[in-house]
Amino acid sequence: MSAQRCKYGEYVTLTKNAFTKSGYTFLGWYTASSGGTKISSTTKITGTVTYYAQWSINSYTLTYNANGGNEVSPASKSVQYGSTYGTLPTPTRNSNAEFTYAFAGWYTAASGGTQVTANTTMGASNTTIYAHWTATRRSYTIGYQTTYGSLNRTSQSVAYGSKGSCTLTMPSNDAQYTYTFQGWYTAANGGGTKVGSSLTLDTPSVTGAATYYAYVTRAVNRYTFTFNANGGSTPSSSSITKSYNEAIGTLPTCSRAADNTYTYAFAGWFDTSATG
Protein backbone atom coordinates (compact mmCIF):
# COMPACT_ATOMS: atom_id res chain seq x y z
CA MET A 1 0.00 0.00 0.00
CA SER A 2 1.07 3.57 -0.64
CA ALA A 3 1.96 5.84 2.27
CA GLN A 4 -0.82 8.06 3.59
CA ARG A 5 -0.13 11.78 4.16
CA CYS A 6 -1.67 13.43 7.25
CA LYS A 7 -1.38 16.76 9.07
CA TYR A 8 0.32 17.00 12.41
CA GLY A 9 -2.06 16.74 15.34
CA GLU A 10 -5.01 15.47 13.27
CA TYR A 11 -7.11 12.48 14.06
CA VAL A 12 -7.11 10.50 10.86
CA THR A 13 -9.08 7.63 9.40
CA LEU A 14 -6.54 5.22 7.99
CA THR A 15 -6.83 3.99 4.42
CA LYS A 16 -8.71 0.70 4.16
CA ASN A 17 -6.37 -2.28 4.31
CA ALA A 18 -5.54 -3.59 0.84
CA PHE A 19 -3.22 -6.34 2.01
CA THR A 20 -4.32 -9.99 1.99
CA LYS A 21 -2.72 -13.02 3.54
CA SER A 22 -3.97 -16.47 2.53
CA GLY A 23 -5.28 -18.42 5.49
CA TYR A 24 -5.33 -15.39 7.81
CA THR A 25 -7.80 -12.72 8.96
CA PHE A 26 -6.76 -9.05 9.22
CA LEU A 27 -6.88 -7.89 12.86
CA GLY A 28 -6.00 -4.24 12.36
CA TRP A 29 -3.10 -1.79 12.28
CA TYR A 30 -0.57 -1.84 15.11
CA THR A 31 2.45 0.14 16.17
CA ALA A 32 4.65 -2.97 15.93
CA SER A 33 4.79 -6.04 13.73
CA SER A 34 4.14 -8.14 16.83
CA GLY A 35 2.48 -6.83 19.92
CA GLY A 36 2.37 -3.03 20.06
CA THR A 37 -0.75 -0.87 20.29
CA LYS A 38 -3.72 -1.14 17.97
CA ILE A 39 -4.41 2.03 15.99
CA SER A 40 -7.93 3.47 16.12
CA SER A 41 -9.75 6.53 14.77
CA THR A 42 -8.78 8.39 17.97
CA THR A 43 -5.05 8.03 17.30
CA LYS A 44 -3.45 11.48 16.80
CA ILE A 45 -0.76 11.89 14.20
CA THR A 46 2.37 13.50 15.69
CA GLY A 47 4.97 12.64 13.06
CA THR A 48 6.10 10.21 10.42
CA VAL A 49 5.21 6.73 11.56
CA THR A 50 4.89 3.16 10.24
CA TYR A 51 1.95 1.00 11.21
CA TYR A 52 1.92 -2.76 10.82
CA ALA A 53 -0.88 -5.09 9.73
CA GLN A 54 -1.39 -7.93 12.19
CA TRP A 55 -3.17 -11.18 11.35
CA SER A 56 -4.83 -14.13 13.06
CA ILE A 57 -4.51 -17.60 11.55
CA ASN A 58 -7.79 -19.14 10.35
CA SER A 59 -9.23 -22.55 11.06
CA TYR A 60 -11.25 -24.42 8.43
CA THR A 61 -13.71 -27.29 8.50
CA LEU A 62 -12.54 -30.68 7.25
CA THR A 63 -15.64 -32.72 6.33
CA TYR A 64 -15.69 -36.50 5.84
CA ASN A 65 -17.83 -37.93 3.02
CA ALA A 66 -18.19 -41.71 3.41
CA ASN A 67 -19.01 -41.98 -0.32
CA GLY A 68 -21.39 -44.94 -0.03
CA GLY A 69 -20.12 -46.14 3.31
CA ASN A 70 -21.46 -45.63 6.81
CA GLU A 71 -21.12 -42.03 7.93
CA VAL A 72 -18.47 -41.41 10.57
CA SER A 73 -19.04 -39.50 13.79
CA PRO A 74 -18.12 -36.74 14.20
CA ALA A 75 -18.65 -35.95 10.51
CA SER A 76 -16.07 -33.13 10.48
CA LYS A 77 -13.37 -31.37 12.47
CA SER A 78 -11.71 -27.96 12.60
CA VAL A 79 -8.12 -27.75 11.36
CA GLN A 80 -5.92 -24.66 11.51
CA TYR A 81 -4.54 -23.35 8.24
CA GLY A 82 -1.13 -24.85 7.50
CA SER A 83 -1.53 -27.58 10.11
CA THR A 84 -1.74 -31.26 9.22
CA TYR A 85 -5.07 -33.04 9.18
CA GLY A 86 -4.03 -35.27 12.04
CA THR A 87 -5.79 -38.53 12.81
CA LEU A 88 -8.49 -39.43 10.27
CA PRO A 89 -11.36 -41.85 10.96
CA THR A 90 -11.68 -45.27 9.32
CA PRO A 91 -15.18 -45.71 7.89
CA THR A 92 -16.93 -48.98 7.08
CA ARG A 93 -19.24 -50.00 4.26
CA ASN A 94 -21.84 -52.75 4.41
CA SER A 95 -21.55 -55.67 2.02
CA ASN A 96 -24.33 -56.42 -0.45
CA ALA A 97 -25.19 -59.58 -2.35
CA GLU A 98 -22.62 -58.82 -5.03
CA PHE A 99 -19.68 -57.14 -3.26
CA THR A 100 -17.76 -56.78 -0.04
CA TYR A 101 -15.96 -53.47 0.50
CA ALA A 102 -12.61 -52.57 2.05
CA PHE A 103 -11.69 -48.99 2.92
CA ALA A 104 -8.98 -47.75 0.51
CA GLY A 105 -8.23 -44.31 2.00
CA TRP A 106 -9.38 -40.69 1.87
CA TYR A 107 -9.23 -38.71 -1.37
CA THR A 108 -9.90 -35.20 -2.60
CA ALA A 109 -12.69 -36.36 -4.95
CA ALA A 110 -15.43 -38.99 -4.89
CA SER A 111 -13.79 -40.62 -7.92
CA GLY A 112 -10.14 -40.16 -8.73
CA GLY A 113 -8.54 -37.22 -6.98
CA THR A 114 -5.46 -37.28 -4.78
CA GLN A 115 -5.08 -39.37 -1.66
CA VAL A 116 -4.78 -37.48 1.61
CA THR A 117 -3.39 -38.68 4.93
CA ALA A 118 -2.93 -37.50 8.49
CA ASN A 119 0.14 -35.59 7.25
CA THR A 120 -1.72 -33.59 4.58
CA THR A 121 -1.67 -29.83 5.24
CA MET A 122 -4.89 -27.84 5.55
CA GLY A 123 -5.38 -25.23 2.83
CA ALA A 124 -7.15 -21.88 3.02
CA SER A 125 -10.73 -23.09 2.59
CA ASN A 126 -13.23 -25.54 4.01
CA THR A 127 -12.47 -28.97 2.57
CA THR A 128 -14.36 -32.22 2.00
CA ILE A 129 -12.51 -35.50 1.64
CA TYR A 130 -14.04 -38.68 0.25
CA ALA A 131 -13.69 -42.32 1.26
CA HIS A 132 -12.62 -44.65 -1.53
CA TRP A 133 -13.44 -48.36 -1.51
CA THR A 134 -12.03 -51.56 -2.94
CA ALA A 135 -14.88 -53.81 -4.02
CA THR A 136 -14.44 -57.58 -4.06
CA ARG A 137 -17.02 -59.66 -5.89
CA ARG A 138 -18.54 -62.24 -3.58
CA SER A 139 -18.56 -65.97 -4.28
CA TYR A 140 -21.17 -68.45 -3.13
CA THR A 141 -21.22 -72.20 -2.58
CA ILE A 142 -23.42 -74.01 -5.08
CA GLY A 143 -24.30 -77.61 -4.13
CA TYR A 144 -25.45 -80.52 -6.30
CA GLN A 145 -27.30 -83.68 -5.31
CA THR A 146 -28.90 -86.60 -7.11
CA THR A 147 -31.27 -89.39 -6.24
CA TYR A 148 -29.40 -91.95 -8.38
CA GLY A 149 -26.28 -91.90 -10.50
CA SER A 150 -23.05 -89.98 -9.95
CA LEU A 151 -22.05 -86.30 -10.24
CA ASN A 152 -18.75 -84.85 -11.40
CA ARG A 153 -18.90 -82.52 -8.36
CA THR A 154 -21.05 -82.04 -5.28
CA SER A 155 -20.26 -78.36 -4.72
CA GLN A 156 -18.31 -75.45 -6.15
CA SER A 157 -17.60 -71.80 -5.39
CA VAL A 158 -19.11 -69.47 -8.00
CA ALA A 159 -18.75 -65.68 -8.25
CA TYR A 160 -21.87 -63.53 -8.09
CA GLY A 161 -23.41 -63.17 -11.56
CA SER A 162 -21.57 -66.22 -12.97
CA LYS A 163 -22.98 -69.69 -13.55
CA GLY A 164 -22.11 -73.03 -12.03
CA SER A 165 -21.99 -76.34 -13.89
CA CYS A 166 -22.47 -79.99 -12.98
CA THR A 167 -22.78 -83.19 -15.02
CA LEU A 168 -24.81 -86.24 -14.02
CA THR A 169 -23.82 -89.74 -15.11
CA MET A 170 -26.90 -91.95 -15.21
CA PRO A 171 -26.83 -95.38 -13.57
CA SER A 172 -27.08 -98.36 -15.91
CA ASN A 173 -30.37 -100.15 -16.22
CA ASP A 174 -30.25 -103.74 -15.00
CA ALA A 175 -32.57 -106.71 -14.65
CA GLN A 176 -34.18 -105.22 -11.56
CA TYR A 177 -34.42 -101.48 -12.30
CA THR A 178 -34.91 -98.96 -15.11
CA TYR A 179 -33.72 -95.37 -14.43
CA THR A 180 -35.22 -92.23 -15.98
CA PHE A 181 -33.78 -88.72 -15.79
CA GLN A 182 -36.53 -86.18 -15.06
CA GLY A 183 -34.44 -82.98 -14.95
CA TRP A 184 -32.71 -80.61 -12.54
CA TYR A 185 -34.77 -78.91 -9.83
CA THR A 186 -34.36 -76.41 -7.03
CA ALA A 187 -35.70 -78.89 -4.46
CA ALA A 188 -35.29 -82.62 -3.91
CA ASN A 189 -37.43 -85.23 -5.67
CA GLY A 190 -38.65 -82.92 -8.41
CA GLY A 191 -39.74 -80.15 -6.05
CA GLY A 192 -39.37 -76.42 -6.55
CA THR A 193 -38.61 -75.08 -10.02
CA LYS A 194 -37.21 -77.06 -12.93
CA VAL A 195 -33.97 -75.42 -14.11
CA GLY A 196 -32.52 -77.94 -16.56
CA SER A 197 -33.45 -80.84 -18.83
CA SER A 198 -30.04 -82.12 -19.92
CA LEU A 199 -27.60 -84.21 -17.94
CA THR A 200 -25.21 -81.22 -17.74
CA LEU A 201 -26.66 -78.33 -15.77
CA ASP A 202 -25.60 -74.73 -16.33
CA THR A 203 -27.13 -73.04 -13.32
CA PRO A 204 -29.01 -69.75 -13.38
CA SER A 205 -26.77 -66.73 -12.70
CA VAL A 206 -25.64 -66.97 -9.09
CA THR A 207 -27.07 -64.42 -6.64
CA GLY A 208 -26.57 -66.44 -3.45
CA ALA A 209 -25.89 -69.91 -2.09
CA ALA A 210 -28.08 -72.61 -3.64
CA THR A 211 -28.40 -76.35 -4.13
CA TYR A 212 -29.66 -78.03 -7.29
CA TYR A 213 -31.04 -81.55 -7.47
CA ALA A 214 -30.86 -84.05 -10.31
CA TYR A 215 -34.14 -85.95 -10.16
CA VAL A 216 -33.73 -89.53 -11.36
CA THR A 217 -36.60 -91.96 -10.89
CA ARG A 218 -36.15 -95.71 -10.53
CA ALA A 219 -38.80 -98.18 -11.62
CA VAL A 220 -38.79 -101.88 -10.72
CA ASN A 221 -38.92 -103.92 -13.91
CA ARG A 222 -41.97 -106.12 -14.51
CA TYR A 223 -41.93 -109.38 -16.41
CA THR A 224 -44.68 -111.45 -18.02
CA PHE A 225 -44.84 -115.21 -17.65
CA THR A 226 -46.78 -116.93 -20.45
CA PHE A 227 -48.09 -120.45 -19.89
CA ASN A 228 -47.87 -122.85 -22.81
CA ALA A 229 -49.98 -125.97 -22.22
CA ASN A 230 -47.64 -127.87 -24.54
CA GLY A 231 -50.34 -130.14 -25.92
CA GLY A 232 -52.69 -129.79 -23.00
CA SER A 233 -55.71 -127.62 -22.54
CA THR A 234 -55.06 -123.88 -22.24
CA PRO A 235 -55.26 -122.79 -18.58
CA SER A 236 -57.75 -120.15 -17.52
CA SER A 237 -54.88 -117.66 -17.04
CA SER A 238 -52.55 -117.82 -20.01
CA SER A 239 -50.04 -115.33 -18.47
CA ILE A 240 -49.21 -113.36 -15.34
CA THR A 241 -47.07 -110.20 -14.90
CA LYS A 242 -44.94 -109.70 -11.81
CA SER A 243 -42.31 -107.24 -10.60
CA TYR A 244 -38.71 -108.29 -10.36
CA ASN A 245 -38.12 -110.38 -7.23
CA GLU A 246 -41.84 -110.64 -6.57
CA ALA A 247 -43.15 -114.13 -5.79
CA ILE A 248 -45.05 -115.61 -8.73
CA GLY A 249 -47.75 -116.90 -6.46
CA THR A 250 -50.31 -119.57 -7.34
CA LEU A 251 -49.76 -121.07 -10.76
CA PRO A 252 -52.61 -122.31 -12.94
CA THR A 253 -53.02 -126.01 -13.72
CA CYS A 254 -53.96 -127.66 -16.96
CA SER A 255 -54.95 -131.09 -18.22
CA ARG A 256 -54.37 -133.21 -21.28
CA ALA A 257 -56.76 -135.75 -22.68
CA ALA A 258 -55.63 -139.36 -23.01
CA ASP A 259 -54.99 -140.78 -26.45
CA ASN A 260 -54.86 -144.38 -27.73
CA THR A 261 -51.36 -144.80 -26.39
CA TYR A 262 -51.05 -142.68 -23.24
CA THR A 263 -52.80 -141.05 -20.40
CA TYR A 264 -51.31 -137.79 -19.15
CA ALA A 265 -50.82 -136.31 -15.69
CA PHE A 266 -49.80 -132.64 -15.23
CA ALA A 267 -46.20 -132.60 -13.99
CA GLY A 268 -45.72 -128.85 -13.46
CA TRP A 269 -44.42 -125.83 -15.33
CA PHE A 270 -40.93 -125.71 -16.78
CA ASP A 271 -38.93 -123.10 -18.61
CA THR A 272 -38.19 -125.51 -21.49
CA SER A 273 -40.48 -127.45 -23.76
CA ALA A 274 -40.96 -131.12 -22.84
CA THR A 275 -42.83 -134.08 -24.30
CA GLY A 276 -43.45 -137.55 -22.96
Model-predicted regions and their roles:
Residues 1-276:
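Secondary-structure capping and domain/repeat boundary segments
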